[in-house]
Amino acid sequence: MATFSYFQNYPHSLLDPLLFPTPHSSINLTSFIDQNHLYPLPNISTVEDISFLEYNVDKTENSGSEKLANTTKTATTGSSSCDQLSHGPSAITNTGKTRGRKARNSNNSKEGVEGRKSKKQKRGSKEEPPTDYIHVRARRGQATDSHSLAERVRREKISERMRTLQNLVPGCDKVTGKALMLDEIINYVQTLQTQVEFLSMKLTSISPVVYDFGSDLDGLILQSEMGSPEVGTSFTNAMPTTTPIFPSLLDNSVVPTHAQVQEEGEERENFVDRSGFNNNNFCSFP
């Protein structure tokens, strides 16, 4: 086997020209032998050793190439593993971030949907008025709550009364503003008060004259009743009854005579002259 392997590895040997002569070469065996071209064949053991060594060399070369391939593979795997180790935390963090973002987006989407639903429900509840609720459209400064409706009614009543006062006072319709309107009403009431006081003073000054005139009328009415009862009754029905403002100074039971009436008339004229009243002053008002 060793020789066979040797011949396989080294097919061309020194015996090739002897065993396989070419047509171009004509070799003389005797001359060849004489020239001592023949060499001794190598020993079989040496051939086996050489072939075994060469086989071992081939094996070692093959194993070296395999080792190199394995080392390259391990290097590539090691580099890839190193890359994975080097980029592993960042990749893990990136995946964690993406997952967190997805979770946040899902939570936000859920919260947004829930918020929208709650808003829609609130709007629906606001749009649907309760059964016992009275919708009141209020202006600025007016109450709209149910507990303030009584206050609103009270303010409306006050405003109506202010309008009636404004209509009573002349020239107050043109005034704008509650303060100015109240000032106009106060001034008007004060003027009315002064006029009433002045008239009451005039009446107190001429009250005796008015009373005497009333007593004269009563005497005439009594005389007419005594003379003609029918005329007296008709006259009393036609004339209004006068009530004295102040207590009587004379006795009503006494019927005045003609002389007494004349004396009373003269006294009345003298009193009017002394007081300075006349018909124009009596009827004049401020």
Swiss-Prot record:
tRNA-binding recorded as keyword: no
Subcellular location: Nucleus
One Pfam family matching this protein: HLH
MF terms in GO: DNA binding; DNA-binding transcription factor activity; protein dimerization activity
A biological process term (GO) from this entry: regulation of cell population proliferation
An annotated GO cellular component: nucleus
Keyword line: DNA-binding, Nucleus, Transcription, Transcription regulation
Biased composition (Polar residues): 63-84
Domain named bHLH: residues: 142-192
Alphabetized SUPFAM superfamilies for the sequence: HLH, helix-loop-helix DNA-binding domain
Highest taxon of the lineage: Eukaryota
Region (Disordered): 63-149
Complexes and interactors: Homodimer.
PANTHER family, per database record: STEROL REGULATORY ELEMENT-BINDING PROTEIN (PTHR12565), TRANSCRIPTION FACTOR BHLH137 (PTHR12565:SF431)
Protein name per its UniProtKB record: Transcription factor bHLH137
Organism of derivation: Arabidopsis thaliana (Mouse-ear cress)
Gene name of the encoded protein: BHLH137
